[in-house]
Amino acid sequence: LGKSIQYRRPVTHILGDHWGATFQLTFASMAVAIFIGLGAGILSAVRRHTWVDYGAQIFAILGVSFPSFWVGLILVWIFAIVLGWLPAISNGFGPQLILPSLTLGTAAAAILARLTRSSMLDVLSSDYIRTARAKGLRERIVVWGHALRNALIPVMTVIGLEFGGLLAGAVIIEAVYFRQGLGLRLIEAITSRDYPVIQALVLFAALLY
């Protein structure tokens, strides 16, 4: 892969030094997206036409409408500057990973929420669900024991595709929170015209996607 023009180091060493921070952010964001997205989608379908459903749909619309860097700046302003609860700069794990993972995972959570709701509503209207209800099974068993397993099949496919999107989105989020990962290295390489690093990082992201 060659040597970095800026750092005079092999590109593989730069990848090795910074890939961990990016993957921490990506996996944490995926966990946030799955937890919030699936939870909101399931509750929205089960509580259809209630305030829970409407709130989840509003979240899904707003989540995919706002750009991630804007969401990141708003979260920094609220939780780091105004409230002072969380650090504005993310260079590690634990509390320093909360704001970046929330920022990056919001859009993916919104997508998963809409897909989960649609899939759950489709399954809940199936014949075998009506049969299970007619036999007198509890609604909790019908939803969690029968409907959810089939409703998650298309959702799991999208979760796999979202991983690549989160990895690519880490470029912007690492710049917002000054996280020392591959995304920040890519931005620095672009501004300094460090072409070997740019080529290596783009190839790395393409292979993972």
PLM features per residue range, with description:
Residues L1, R48, V82-W85, S90:
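Glycine-rich, flexible loop/turn motifs
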Residues L1-H13:
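Short membrane-interfacial helix/loop motifs at transmembrane-helix boundaries
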Residues T12-G20:
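Alpha-helical transmembrane segments of multi-pass membrane transporters/translocases
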Residues W19-V52, S68, S90-Y209:
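Alpha-helical transmembrane segments of integral membrane proteins
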Residues G55:
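Acidic/polar active-site rim loop that often engages polyanionic ligands
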